[in-house]
């Protein structure tokens, strides 16, 4: 079979596993067609009980040696709890398996065999045959690491909550997609699963993945974003994907739009953003309050800071947890460096000089402000360069068209804000430029390291090679870069924008890194 894998699963040759399948196959509904399952019994609490402490990780730093730069000092990693189980992965494939995940069971007194079992083929999950057809058609041959660990936990019965943290581009979307497709009953024409995303761009992408994997099923999807639905029309699709505000509006309108009592699964993609961001967080919690207490809550993100983790534990009580070791949050395949400039003007001149590198594949340039994104795009276009700008002030239809054009390769360089910093998957992106260092906003002190991780995660996805360049121009931005290096324990090569030799070396290094082996 010609492999059309888009990176959601590994492409290594499938291997058989000697262990029996876990007790995780979905239970058939009364229709006995292999779809859906009986509604789980309601928990004793109201969904807001305190959960266990958040999980940490430890391990050695792995420097790829691309640049001869000293490794900055890093803080001592947190002490691992006795209840953490370290899982190794020996498979090979598209995704470079250099990181480790830790699985924390919600109930350590239960049978450890099923939750700890890691499948090595999709067949071991006892999925419906129509889902297996979709997996094959999508080019999957073998689960990625996060899928291997998460799917047995997600599909086990009775359903359990799950909090999953794994680096960008490792297949989280396909994992929760298979769970939703397995939990809903296609013979019932009403929403039974909801997936919340922080942006319309990410919501549209998630719908595409669900439609691709579920193409041989009778499961329908509905995109719940501003302007996508008539306020008086009833939703007859089984899976809703959308942004918080629109979903709250739908749920508040009651049974004439959809029946909240039928919802079985609630998924938060980029959960830390949904929980922490003012406005989005309130709407996300409102959605939870409008749903039955026995809904399976599934939270996924590439990052979870301690504060967000505390809220996640309350949002998804007694959840199974899958975490990356903290020092493995960034991807080794991404070559990180920073360009030292003297002024804002020199930053633009350096970006313009690097245009030939930006179009080797595709590139995303992240700015702090919308006006900056537009200004840079206008200047580059006036100089004859083909670029586009994208941010939240543009009309919805225009945003969709711009991102579709970039995804299809019509545009090589996209100048944008954080609107696509999270979750967006465009495999051809092999370079990310942080034109402005992400900061914590008004009242914040220092760089927003989580946003930095998400930004550079737009490249180097699914084990592909990629480069990240961050621009500095004053004391604060240089200090912020030092803090990023110290926190991540990842060295960056300094390039002097004033040096013609350095710029030439940078161009050669970038071209070599993006064309040669990672």
UniProtKB/Swiss-Prot annotation:
Instruction: Identify the species of origin.
Output: Cryptococcus neoformans var. neoformans serotype D (strain JEC21 / ATCC MYA-565)
Question: Does this UniProt record's set of keywords contain Cell cycle?
Answer: no
The record, for PROSITE patterns, names: DEAD_ATP_HELICASE, HELICASE_ATP_BIND_1, HELICASE_CTER, Q_MOTIF
Record-listed E.C. numbers: 3.6.4.13
Keyword Protein transport among record annotations: yes
Where the record places motif Q motif is 120-148
**Quaternary structure annotation from Swiss-Prot or TrEMBL:** Associates with the nuclear pore complex.
Query: What is one GO cellular-component annotation here?
Result: nuclear pore cytoplasmic filaments
Gene this protein is translated from: DBP5
Name where it's found: Cytoplasm; Nucleus, Nuclear pore complex; Nucleus membrane
Stretches assigned to the Helicase ATP-binding domain: 153-322
Q: Where is this motif: DEAD box?
A: 269-272
Protein name (database record): ATP-dependent RNA helicase DBP5
